[in-house]
């Protein structure tokens, strides 16, 4: 589908069975090799070092300029002091030798990872960190971790999770700030 194309930046957020099917990739090996092909078509790569499979990429493609991000492991763009509520995530990140506070109005640890990836892309493209942090604070995705206001103040969230991994991500996010059952 992309033969002959050259890309500026490739981002590998995580490696899961989301794309294993008759229509996409027959197995995890094929899926990973496809991702490697994409990275070979790019001068710059951005990877989540907290994902074990993804963190292998710099060794496999030493010629690429790889930027790393994460929460738990050593990397170039690292989130610290993370707060996750039922309506947002807030964290500190070091960008261009400055510590910045980042707030994204989509709850869940996955939102921290997505924001870190966006910060890395912006940095590679030469976009000022304050601009990307402003943009992240404005993100609203209808149907994605969307809180529903109601008179009883019961936490109700709409989310379009459509795969086992995305469903697990949102359920983990919700469970972290609720008591009892999550329906």
Predicted stretch roles:
Residues 141, 164-183:
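Active-site beta-alpha connecting loops in nucleotide-dependent enzymes
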Residues 159:
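Conserved phosphate/oxyanion-binding catalytic-loop motifs
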Residues 2-156, 179-180:
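Acidic, Mg2+-coordinating active-site environments of NTP-dependent enzymes
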């Amino acid at each position: 589908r992309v033969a002959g194309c050259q890309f500026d930046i490739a981002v590998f957020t995580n490696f899961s069975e989301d794309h294993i099917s008759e229509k996409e990739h027959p197995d995890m090996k094929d899926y990973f090799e496809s991702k490697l092909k994409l990275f070979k078509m790019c001068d710059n790569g951005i990877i989540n070092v907290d994902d074990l499979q993804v963190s292998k990429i710099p060794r496999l493609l030493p010629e690429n300029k790889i930027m790393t991000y994460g929460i738990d492991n050593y990397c170039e763009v690292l989130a610290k002091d993370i707060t996750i509520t039922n309506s947002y995530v807030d964290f500190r990140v070091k960008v261009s030798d400055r510590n910045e506070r980042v707030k994204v109005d989509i709850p869940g640890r996955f939102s921290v990872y997505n924001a870190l990836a966006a910060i890395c892309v912006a940095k590679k493209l030469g976009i000022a960190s304050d601009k990307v942090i402003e943009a992240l604070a404005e993100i609203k995705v209808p149907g994605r971790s969307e809180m529903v206001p109601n008179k009883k103040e019961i936490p109700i969230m709409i989310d379009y999770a459509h795969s086992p991994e995305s469903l697990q991500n949102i359920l983990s996010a919700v469970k972290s700030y609720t008591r009892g059952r999550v329906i």
